[in-house]
Amino acid sequence: MGLFGKLFGGDEQQTQAPAANTPIQTASTEGREVTLDLNKGGMLNLAKNDFLNLSKTDFSLENIRVSAGWDVKTSFFGSDFDLDLCAFLLDASGHLTRSVNGLVYFGKKKSQGIQLDHDNLTGAGDGDDENMFVNFNNIHPDVAQIVVAVVIYSGKNRKQYFGQVKNAYVRLVDQAQRPEKEIARFNLSEDGGKATAVKFAELTRTVNGWTFKAVGEYLNASIQDIEKSYR
């Protein structure tokens, strides 16, 4: 299905999304803090619940790229898998911000300081499938957290689930360096079963700057379901 169908075709409403008015579930400081010395040329492989304080690196991380990739099983008879990278911009109470566009996805690719690139409708090819560009200096001050998720478009209707998705990952890239420097990567190792979405990561504003946390929380939800849970 093309972009027109995605925008106006009416994705299914599933029943197992988080409850409405759910505040931010996971503080950025819950989990294991990891550190990185970019001068030593390192790159972090994050485990679930690991978080990286971006202000503690040896470079000023102001312009980053959040990239996601995956492999899916193909079928001669089934529909192509269409996985979508999206971001939910939350205020300090854990709800979608009203100060700027609070949902960045294939239908509205920009918000202040955030932009998605092209929408990969099939996931074909090697490397990153979709990318989100973040300029922390331009993020609206009311935005306290950015939840990064990947959702299978119309997954339930097509009987497509994360249990059929392999080698899924999200990675953080410093765009200010030339060549670009991969800072951290989180490989999704758990079986997704019948889930149709995954909260991959959280970017959270703290008094000292931003943190990046590997989440890896599976959901039986559409983009609309997740959006409703943050209202």
Spell out what each predicted region is.
Residues 2-145, 149-231:
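Intrinsic-disorder/low-complexity signal
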